[in-house]
Design a protein with these regions (language model features):
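Active-site rim beta-loop-alpha module in soluble metabolic enzymes
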Residues: 101-166
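Structural signal for conserved beta-strand scaffold positions within catalytic alpha/beta enzyme cores
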Residues: 40, 68, 86, 122-125, ...
Length: 214
């Protein structure tokens, strides 16, 4: 009798806000691509680091792929709420973490939410909401978007062991479309709808990064 294959390791999706977790749960379609755990970390880099480190310390999530997602501030002129950002790397003052499967994510996201622009480049981490002139400074340093948790999430995941990592964010405000309060303006609603639609792309990324290297 042949031995059944071992179950695929799960995908850990980390987000900061309850509204982000709600969007992901509403968007779940089926179980293809392996099991998924959605972790709400809380806001800010310190909360993300604590929450992810605690999750990865347990045996149930040992060796899992980690994907950071949620909303972000777009830094490049011409970005709009609902645009997507696929990080080539995440960075903060402690260093940078390269992301895996960027091209595949771009392809799958374009299929999941046709008509929404997908931007690629460095995603920078901050410890506060960025506005006005600070956006320009971060853009001049090479980043295309900013958020408070992705860099801390991926750095913590990388330090916990070798694993695939990625970050995908939905632009909720941009230089020409600054957001006052998430969920109260059109930009926030648009970003929520996009986030609700992209879990299938994450599952496909996960399925592919689990394939043996050639």
């Amino acid at each position: 009798m042949s031995t059944p294959p071992a179950p695929a390791p799960p995908l850990l999706i980390a987000c900061a806000l309850g509204i982000e977790r709600l969007a992901l749960r509403l968007g779940e379609r089926d179980g293809t691509g392996g099991p998924v755990t959605v972790l709400r970390t809380g806001m800010g880099p310190e909360a993300a680091e604590r929450s992810v480190a605690r999750a990865l310390a347990g045996p149930a999530l040992a060796g899992v792929a980690v994907l950071a997602t949620g909303f972000c501030a777009g830094l490049a002129p011409g970005m709009h709420p609902g645009d997507l950002v696929v990080a080539e790397e995440t960075r903060d003052p402690r260093g940078s973490v390269p992301c895996e499967g960027t091209d595949l994510l771009v392809e799958e996201l374009a299929r999941a939410v046709p008509g929404h622009a997908v931007h690629t480049g460095p995603l920078t981490g901050t410890d506060h909401v960025v506005r006005g002139p600070e956006r320009a400074r971060l853009r001049d340093a090479g980043a295309i978007a900013a958020d408070m948790e992705s860099a801390a999430t991926l750095l913590t995941a990388a330090r916990a062991g070798t694993r695939p990592v990625a970050a995908v964010r939905v632009v909720v405000d941009a230089p020409e479309h600054e957001l006052v309060r998430i969920g109260t303006v059109r930009g926030g609603i648009s970003a929520f709808r996009v986030l609700r639609s992209i879990l299938p792309a994450f599952r496909e990324w996960h399925r592919n990064v689990l394939l043996p290297r050639r």
